[in-house]
Amino acid sequence: MTEMNTAPQLAPRERCTGCAACCNGCPKGAIRMVPDREGFLYPQVTDGCVQCGHCTHICPVLKQREPRTEPAAFIVWNGDEAVRRNSTAGGAFSALAEYVLEGGGVVFGAALDSGLRVSHIAVKNRHDLPQLRGSKPVQSDVGESYQQVRLYLDQGRQVLFSGTPCQVDGLYRYLGEHPERLITCDVACSGVGSPGVWEKFVRSMAYIKQQKPLSVDFRGKLNGESTRRFHVTFENGGQYDAPLLRSEVGRGLARGMFLRPACHTCGYTSTDRTGDLTLCDMTGGAITPEEKRLGVSLLLINTAKGAQVFDSLPLHRRRCSLAEAVAADRALRSPTPVSVDRSRFFDALEQEPFRQVCARFLSALQPREAAGKPLKELLGNVRLPFGKRKQK
């Protein structure tokens, strides 16, 4: 059966994850990713399209993947106490990335650039690895990362690709296979925030402080505390620090105010994962108060390759049941509900000053929200890969 003369069919807008497999895979380069009014990237077909149908063929939304066997679940933490102490969770991502780099491989993951925009980059040495560490709950622009992954694989190098489950699925669809030298790690994600809204936050912080924000830690811990904090460092040494739940960014993420529409019906919120390994949150239940304070990660082993890599990592580990894992991380069982105010929020963004919109929709949490366990649970799961925080 040929793909010729097949009209280009892309995922319905409300289901499109923005994985960019179609854009990377178009043999004519006739698809580009364009931001919409909410700041999310969507594929746009240009006049260069020859209607080969390849984009339809590789779209993860339009072509369902085969289910996998039930994963094994482990509570893990890095054997290096310094790394663990300065990590968002247990330092598992650091161990995995260093394992690949030490073997001469390349690590792909989400990073913040000088303008605090989130995009996927390739890291080839330990010196640059901190760029990939830490939580980034804003949707990452994968750019041409899938093409770069193929290039490094063709050169015979091992590659680790980390990202949301839809990005990992998009990579596999683009490649059309599961190469032996490719290791994938998806994160149990509760949704990705709007890059457009995040850009407005960055501009707002710069205006209020009258100085450029240089770095952001979305889910930091101070002095080994388990409370997640939103921390910003500015160019003249000024800082902003608050519990994530008390920051406008955290409130918006927790309320599902500016997540990508497809996230609210996400088909990846289950234990049937796309990566060889899955990083999840483990903040209660099967862990002790001391483990919660120091930080541990929940790791799912989804494939034989994932098990082989896991056995090589310098991680302390303890087996837990899959039921405990699902109970610990909401992203393994259901999508994030959409806010009833979401449409009004984005309508207001087009008509009113940003600070005015924040005051109306992202003000202090209502008592029922502040006390609700589901909200706290959600805040623990909105992220990209775990990892080491930069020391202050």
What name fits each language-model region?
Residues 183-204:
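Short, flexible loop segments at boundaries between secondary-structure elements
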Residues 14-29, 50-62, 164-170, 259-271:
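Local cysteine-cluster metal-coordination motifs and their immediate loop/turn environment
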Residues 88-91, 114, 161-171, 191-193:
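Gly/Ser/Thr-rich loops at beta-strand to alpha-helix junctions
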Residues 103-106, 211-392:
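Long, compositionally biased charged/polar accessory segments in the mid-to-C-terminal portions
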Residues 3, 8, 12-15, 21-44, ...:
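Iron-sulfur cluster-binding cysteine motifs and their immediate structural context
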Residues 1-6, 48-155, 321, 325-341, ...:
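Flanking helices and flexible, charged tails adjoining ferredoxin-like Fe-S electron-transfer domains
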Residues 6-16, 41, 46-50, 156-159, ...:
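Immediate flanking context of iron-sulfur cluster ligation sites
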Residues 128, 176-188:
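A short alpha->loop->secondary-structure connector
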